[in-house]
Amino acid sequence: SMYDHPFQWGSERTGPDLARVGGRYSDAWHVQHLKDPRSVVPESIMPTYAFLADTDLDLNDASAKLRALKDVGVPYSNKDIADAVLDMKAQADPNADARDLMKRYPKAQQRDFDGNPGRLTEMDALVAYLQVLGTMVDVNAAAAQEDLATERGR
């Protein structure tokens, strides 16, 4: 994503490029892949992340994390920061009133991501994240930036 901050430029990246994985696979596929990678990709060397389904999502510092991201240039509003926990709960609950969330994040998806509607888990959070990767890219804006760079001889 355009707001990712790699810990070290040029560091080795292991695994597939997930930049555009959003929407390519179902939530159930992602959950199965995270629980037992070789059951869906036999040659996978990825370790299992089944524990994510059993780990409740820690909501205690969500606002602080968004505030820190805002400090390094991610365009979160004060309302985004104040409502971080409410937004996370609403996004993972298909029965919640998510009108305010959808107004601020029009491309957000609202549903139970991990197949366990009774709990908000780290699996919900990771699958929701994977499902959004690459879906918010404005290809026209990116192309316009490339055209501008070419015009300026870069």
PLM-predicted stretches and their roles:
Residues 1-154:
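Periplasmic c-type cytochrome electron-transfer domains
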